[in-house]
């Protein structure tokens, strides 16, 4: 059995899980998330803990139990605490400004870059060079952060560009004559 799939998920106070044949829905103080189920994994809700078991002894069912457990754990954490990614702009004249559900970026191009946020994602700019992306869906938060970073990834010689706050950019040495 999968090592990850063996571990039960304890539902914190304020979070509740509803399991049907097709999907699992987790509701919490920040919102609700749903995940489609397949027949390879059985989920039991026993007094505030969720247990995951493969439906049969196949390798696929074993792997899916660990995968589904990780996805549901992220859903529980999302609806109770939420997720956030912090991006930094490094470079002269690089600026960011949040306006409602849009993020205006000035990244050294001849035109401003406007990134529209999907539903359920909030963006803040504490300073002009910091971007904070928040939401309850871990996958969506990471996807939006990756899309914003892709506009101007850090270049290896000076390190200019959009980077994650915990990202380490290895600076290359310039060519010598």
UniProtKB/Swiss-Prot annotation:
One of its GO terms (biological process) is cytoplasmic translation. GO terms for cellular component: cytosolic large ribosomal subunit. Pfam families: Ribosomal_L6. Disulfide bonds: none annotated. It comes from the Bacteria. Keywords: Ribonucleoprotein, Ribosomal protein, RNA-binding, rRNA-binding. GO terms for molecular function: rRNA binding; structural constituent of ribosome. Belongs to the universal ribosomal protein uL6 family. Part of the 50S ribosomal subunit. This protein binds to the 23S rRNA, and is important in its secondary structure. It is located near the subunit interface in the base of the L7/L12 stalk, and near the tRNA binding site of the peptidyltransferase center. This is Large ribosomal subunit protein uL6. It comes from Herminiimonas arsenicoxydans. The lineage of its organism: Bacteria, Pseudomonadati, Pseudomonadota, Betaproteobacteria, Burkholderiales.
């Amino acid at each position: 059995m999968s090592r990850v799939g063996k571990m039960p998920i304890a539902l914190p106070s304020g979070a509740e899980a509803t399991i049907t044949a097709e999907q699992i829905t987790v509701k919490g103080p920040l919102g609700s998330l749903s995940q489609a189920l397949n027949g390879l994994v059985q989920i039991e809700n026993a007094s505030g803990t969720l247990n995951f078991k493969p439906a049969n002894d196949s390798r696929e069912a074993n792997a899916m139990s660990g995968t589904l457990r990780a996805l549901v754990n992220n859903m529980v954490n999302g609806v109770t605490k939420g997720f956030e990614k912090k991006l930094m702009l490094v470079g002269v004249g690089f600026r960011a400004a949040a306006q409602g559900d849009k993020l205006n970026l000035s990244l050294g191009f001849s035109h401003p870059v406007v990134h529209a946020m999907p539903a359920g994602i909030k963006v803040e700019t504490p300073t002009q060079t910091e971007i904070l992306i928040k939401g309850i869906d871990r996958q969506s938060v990471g996807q939006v952060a990756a899309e914003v970073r892709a506009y101007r990834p850090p270049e290896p010689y000076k390190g200019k560009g959009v980077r994650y706050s915990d990202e380490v950019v290895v600076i290359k040495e310039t060519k010598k004559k």
